[in-house]
Amino acid sequence: MHPSLLSPTSLGPSGSLHSPISTLSSPMNGLGSPFSVISSPMGPHSMASPGVGYGPSISPQLNSHMNSVSSSEDIKPPLGLNGVMKVPAQPSGTPLSLTKHICAICGDRSSGKHYGVYSCEGCKGFFKRTVRKDLTYTCRDNKDCVIDKRQRNRCQYCRYQKCLAMGMKREAVQEERQRAKERSENEVESTSSANEDMPVEKILEAELAVEPKTETYIETNVPMPSNSPNDPVTNICQAADKQLFTLVEWAKRIPHFSELPLDDQVILLRAGWNELLIASFSHRSIAVKDGILLATGLHVHRNSAHSAGVGAIFDRVLTELVSKMRDMQMDKTELGCLRAIVLFNPDSKGLSNPGEVEALREKVYASLEAYCKHKYPEQPGRFAKLLLRLPALRSIGLKCLEHLFFFKLIGDTPIDTFLMEMLEAPHQMT
């Protein structure tokens, strides 16, 4: 297939949408499919297995969060440490790490070794502030004030002198500050590198470019007979059919997608179209109460869905996707990254180079994690929370496919050209 098939769709003289493939004399152009890449000849195994999960591909960045709990502080005391008083010896067999210490400065309970000495959080913080701000103190008495748990705040001069006498090191505070600075610089460099490979700005642009311009919303919350031309199942199918037209345009705007072999682009779109559309209308429905907002501007209420016999899957969309997206206030950049992760599915059958697709997915993971750290620094678990929506999206996508195949089988629901093409694709290729 010629690369020109990936040119943008256009409006004809009548205002109707024309496929980019309509200008070619291919025998497969009769349907006028919006999937310019879909008409590429493929082998019998180009359809992705619907049962493939996200498990093995979960980002190593997520794993790093789960493995970073080891302490940098050594709480095992060296024998004979000056100024440290031990509680009575523990019974034999008690791990040394469980032995409790008291603060060498004031006698309060120690929280570990800080700047070379076992000390409490209060004395640790006092010493750090003194060094970092280069503070100087004076003693009102004879520079021999008692420093204990009750009186440690009475004389800052004597408290600081005792910190030094017990072995606290000024240079340890300065080294800690330098390490923090270097760590921050490394994180900025890592964030910049990840974003250069897979810029989230481009992913956001892709989302905004295909966003439906719906000015008015039509609400359907009155139950209608299932054979009505306006029943919710028909409305959803018609909206999905229209959105399939924009899906290729969206994918072409995702960084590096158009660089993949044409047949691989076809495979990835066929494998993920249902999840990609579900993610979109779920996020679009965040502001809607007890319903979903379709790209056509139609608001489908859950009462209508229950009347049409699709209440169970409809409620799953509301509780597992729409509600979760609303609660965490998922933004469009995060939505775009999740959809890009779905698109770059290395487990799709028939890919010529799954490793290349997996590398692109990893780049999206890295960019999304960096974006979350930068945009939401007060929510360290946000990246993981976003990824946890993917299994629910996969499960709901499979169930929706089952419903669509059933509607196609019984023939009660009109299914338009493009959606029918996607449902019949596996049979056409075998």
Swiss-Prot record:
Residues 1-25, 48-73, 174-196 are annotated as: Disordered. Residues 128-133 are annotated as: Nuclear localization signal. 9-cis-retinoate binds at residues 284, 295. PROSITE patterns: NR_LBD, NUCLEAR_REC_DBD_1, NUCLEAR_REC_DBD_2. Keywords: DNA-binding, Metal-binding, Nucleus, Receptor, Transcription, Transcription regulation, Zinc, Zinc-finger. A zinc finger (NR C4-type) spans 103-123, 139-158. Homodimer. Heterodimer; with a rar molecule. Binds DNA preferentially as a rar/rxr heterodimer. This is Retinoic acid receptor RXR-alpha-A. It comes from Danio rerio (Zebrafish).
